[in-house]
Curated annotation (Swiss-Prot):
Biological process per Gene Ontology, one example term: DNA-templated transcription termination
Biological classification of the source: Bacteria, Bacillati, Bacillota, Bacilli, Bacillales
One Pfam family matching this protein: NusB
Organism the protein comes from: Staphylococcus aureus (strain MRSA252)
GN (gene name): nusB
Claim: Transcription is one of the keywords in the record: yes
Protein known as: Transcription antitermination protein NusB
MF terms in GO: RNA binding
InterPro entries attached to this UniProt entry: NusB-like_sf, NusB_fam, NusB_RsmB_TIM44
HAMAP family listed in its UniProt record: NusB
């Protein structure tokens, strides 16, 4: 399966891990999707999910200066997760930033409010510079 589908699953895993009552480990959360989606790139999903969780404070420090009149805490959970995922991938992978940004915009269109993709694109454009 494609990286796009793997990013969707990574997003959903991170969303699940952010639930207030979640005691799940990363491996447990990922194991729930393996049975239904055996063809996904689980190495990539684990890399992205664990990277975002392990580097969350640094990612937030990178994102925050690019949030005009917003704070990380005020963002929708979906937008916060997508920004963290994309920022991590831009900073720590060989995937072109343009590809990562496009995938983040598509995730935002799928999982967030209607026009938030413009906000996500703007923030990531500033981070990529």
């Amino acid at each position: 399966m494609s990286r796009k589908e793997s990013r969707v699953q990574a997003f959903q895993t991170l969303f699940q891990l952010e639930m207030k009552d979640s005691d799940l480990t990363i491996n447990e959360a990922i194991s729930f999707i393996k049975d239904d989606n055996p063809d996904l790139d689980f190495e990539f999903i684990h890399w992205l999910v664990s990277g975002v969780k392990d580097h969350e404070p640094v990612l937030d420090e990178t994102i925050s200066p690019n949030l005009k009149d917003w704070t990380i805490a005020r963002l929708l959970k979906t937008d916060r997760i997508i920004l963290r995922m994309a920022t991590y991938e831009i900073l720590h992978s060989d995937t072109p930033a343009k590809v990562v940004m496009n995938e983040a915009v598509e995730l935002t269109k799928q999982f967030s409010d209607d026009d938030h993709y413009k906000f996500i694109n703007g923030v990531l454009s500033n981070i990529k510079k």
